[in-house]
Amino acid sequence: MPDLLIWGDTIRSPELRHEVPVTIPDGFLYAEAGGRRAVVIHALEIPRVRMETDLEIVAHEQLGSDELFALGIPRWQIDQELVLRGCRELGVVEAAVPASFPVGLADFLRDHGIELRVDRELFDRRRRAKNEAELAGIRRAQKACEAGLDAARELLRRAQQDGDGLDVDGEPLTSERLKRVIEDVFADHDVEAGSMIVSHGPQTAVGHDLGSGQIHVDEPVVFDLFPKDKQTGCYADMTRTYVVGEPSDEVKEWHRLVKEALDRSTAEVKPGANGRALYELVCDIFQSAGYKTQLNKEPGEVLEDGFFHGLGHGVGLEVHEGPSLGRIGHDLIPGDVITVEPGLYRAGYGGLRLEDLVLVTEAGHEVITDYPYELEP
């Protein structure tokens, strides 16, 4: 195993948060060198790191930070020098770093004789299999998803038709209002809401349209929720689609096909299953029903109808991470947490998507999501 270096903070660096499960807002160095696992860190953070991890701690003060501050040089230069001194203290002369490693810091270390090699795959693999704490955080975030959607569905059920729009308690029922209700529930569950999707009508056919405006009768409403557990920094991800009123025959067909695709692809999830093969299974279902996918379109065609996105992705310290289930697919391993999210769309009209969160286990899989799929809210 090569020596490793990661520099950043545990709020923005998933690679670092996986190794140091403590919320630290300022940049610091994590190193694996010669069998040692250590952090080079400010004294302010030492008590929590000592309490919550078994990492070796090298304090900035041990490396001469007081003398560096007395020189009056810029803080970024002090940080670079402390990282260099930390590397020398730990015996690092050559190391692998993630793609997020700061370019300026990398140049500085190389200029001082430390060889660095970016190894994206190495760091992605290290956090593929979720540890016990990360899984607990994902499950908490998923429970928050379900509670938030419960609250939103209650508003949909109470909605009254006013023309072709929907009102609740005499006020228009909008995407923004539904989001606020969900955000309140998320706050109660100690998760961060992020930029959730509550889209409706033609918006639902536009990839990652966050949604806005008044909800209308008989149109699809897509809820794609991906809150982050504050304790661990881990995400969940779930999508459901509803219609207040009477869904069209087209939407009913989409729902039947998408649910079939979800069930059949999820059934194949196990260690060694390939993400591309699962994607092809779903594309076959949709293509057999006459829909376009990325596999049967014309070369160079920009697809706006049918099934135009991947089947899923990994979820953990990032809401989108490895493995991939799409035209590029990875073999699944025990401990992967993935989404399975087939959908069908027609530009200018709408779309329908269902998404579950699935844990790959030694014996096969576990569907973490525990929520109904009906179109009626």
Label each PLM-derived region with a short phrase:
Residues 1-377:
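Active-site neighborhoods and metal-handling regions in enzymes and metal-associated proteins
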